């Protein structure tokens, strides 16, 4: 949510700052009332990534607002720092979190995407090729 607002060019800076402040307040309220949410918000995945020794495929869309592409190099580095020698990372152009063609990737706009809403064929090819090479 917050990332989507921070990159939303349709809002004025004042409106964006107010909505971000409102989200921070809501997140704090959720964390205070829900133990799982508190854990989720505090969880840092890098130590776990460093312990993974199996092959890893990291895929995200360039317009993903949920697993932002800027974090891909950090994830890749964490896996490799732990000694993982088989880490593949790709940021796929023009796609959102669902691997669907999307101009901005904001989840609130998913319902407005024109049909057919399908994972692009090249994404499936990347996954199949990656698996085929490792499951011989």
Over which residues does each language-model region extend?
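Short beta-strand/loop motif that positions the catalytic acidic residue
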Residues: 52, 58-60, 64
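Conserved alpha/beta-hydrolase "acid-adjacent" motif
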Residues: 65-74
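Conserved beta-strand segments of alpha/beta enzyme cores
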Residues: 86-88
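Accessory cap/linker subdomain of secreted extracellular hydrolases
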Residues: 1-51
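Catalytic active-site module of serine/aspartate enzymes centered on a nucleophile-bearing elbow/loop
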Residues: 82, 95-99, 104-136
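Solvent-exposed, polar/charged alpha-helical surfaces in well-ordered, non-transmembrane soluble domains
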Residues: 47-50, 73, 77, 125, ...
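Acidic beta-to-alpha connecting loop that harbors the catalytic carboxylate
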Residues: 62-64, 93-96
């Amino acid at each position: 949510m917050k990332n989507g607002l921070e990159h939303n060019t349709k809002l004025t800076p004042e409106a964006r700052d107010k909505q971000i402040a409102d989200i921070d307040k809501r997140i704090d309220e959720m964390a205070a009332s829900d133990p799982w949410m508190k854990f989720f918000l505090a969880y840092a995945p890098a130590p776990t990534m460093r312990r993974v020794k199996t092959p890893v495929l990291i895929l995200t869309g360039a317009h993903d607002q949920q697993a932002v592409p800027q974090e891909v190099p950090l994830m890749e580095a964490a896996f490799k720092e732990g000694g993982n020698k088989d880490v593949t990372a790709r940021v796929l152009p023009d796609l959102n979190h669902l691997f669907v063609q999307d101009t901005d990737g904001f989840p609130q706009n998913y319902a407005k995407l024109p049909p057919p809403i399908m994972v692009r064929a090249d994404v499936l090819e990347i996954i199949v090729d990656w698996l085929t090479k490792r499951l011989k």
